[in-house]
Amino acid sequence: MQKLAVYVYIYLFMQIAVDPVALDGSSQPTENAEKDGLCNACTWRQNTKSSRIEAIKIQILSKLRLEQAPNISRDVIKQLLPKAPPLQELIDQYDVQRDDSSDGSLEDDDYHATTETIITMPTESDFLVQMEGKPKCCFFKFSSKIQYNKVVKAQLWIYLRQVQKPTTVFVQILRLIKPMKDGTRYTGIRSLKLDMNPGTGIWQSIDVKTVLQNWLKQPESNLGIEIKAFDETGRDLAVTFPGPGEDGLNPFLEVRVTDTPKRSRRDFGLDCDEHSTESRCCRYPLTVDFEAFGWDWIIAPKRYKANYCSGECEFVFLQKYPHTHLVHQANPRGSAGPCCTPTKMSPINMLYFNGKEQIIYGKIPAMVVDRCGCS
């Protein structure tokens, strides 16, 4: 009997030595396994984040139809960028894009009206080239996304050079038309009288909404405009073709369009932060910083919240995808299983320089992960 007790004691001692028990009752190997699991999850998320950033770079260039990032220095950008109030407001607005995808029970971006501001710069026109003499500006091409019944606001911005004394300036905006029998080539759009004080030049906006809507209804009538701004001595103060020291002072159109998309219900997914221990498929935050890439050619936004998906898709959580579960049950070896992937994405608005040093406005689709799921 005593020998049996000794054997039992030795057996228990060896078990403790091989598998020591912590004071709180948990085993050390279990704790290590949990730590290893968390480390593996962190490593996986870090790799996923890096892959997401590289994919974003490729997607942006591809969707903008650019073979490579435009090579434009910051000094050149300062010369080309219009120094106008509405553009600066737009840059400030998109400096850091907000992430509203988790607010409310409805899709904010699908339910509320969204307004876009489009900055259109003047381009060359065959009609202007064929005219005798040099017109005082300007021909504008318009994006197909601008529909006449969606235009909320259309402002022509012109820069007036400084004056040396209090001066009255007469501004006239003319629309070019096909020559009439009497030789008329212009029709008036707007005329106004301004009082200018000595000092720096000023930006002046003129409402051209009606004209723009007519152009959109009848594109063939868009032949361009002429801008005149004379002081009392006959000096033209309007900057139409910028001279030395007048970079960024070109005339341009600021157009605001609005639309109210179809209302839809939100299908919630999981949202996590970088310190989360959640193992299931989840959306994690990721801020893309274009300046960190050296992509100075992107005017706005400089940063935006892209987000990414990471996590496991276990079959026990797949009530939403019964067909996937049935396929796995029928052929478990041949099914790779569902992946954690974006189930809803939204676009970002972007102002950027293309390879020809032109300022372009565009909406890039599917750049923000709003929701993640298993599919």
Swiss-Prot record:
Which cysteines link up through disulfide bonds?
272-282, 281-340, 309-372, 313-374
Give the UniProt keywords, A-Z: Cleavage on pair of basic residues, Cytokine, Disulfide bond, Glycoprotein, Growth factor, Secreted, Signal
Q: Which residues form the propeptide?
A: 24-266
- InterPro entries assigned to the protein according to its UniProt record, in alphabetical order: Cystine-knot_cytokine, TGF-b_C, TGF-b_propeptide, TGF-beta-rel, TGFb_CS
Annotated glycan sites: 71
Sample GO molecular function, one term: cytokine activity
- SUPFAM superfamilies assigned: Cystine-knot cytokines
Main site of residence? secreted
Q: Where does the record say this protein resides?
A: Secreted
Highest taxon listed in the record's lineage: Eukaryota
A Pfam family assignment: TGF_beta
Q: Which residues form the signal peptide?
A: 1-23
Q: What family, per the record?
A: Belongs to the TGF-beta family.
Give a short account of what the protein does: Acts specifically as a negative regulator of skeletal muscle growth.
Subunit text: Homodimer; disulfide-linked.
List the protein's name: Growth/differentiation factor 8
Per the UniProt record, the source organism is Gallus gallus (Chicken)
Which gene is transcribed and translated to give this protein? MSTN
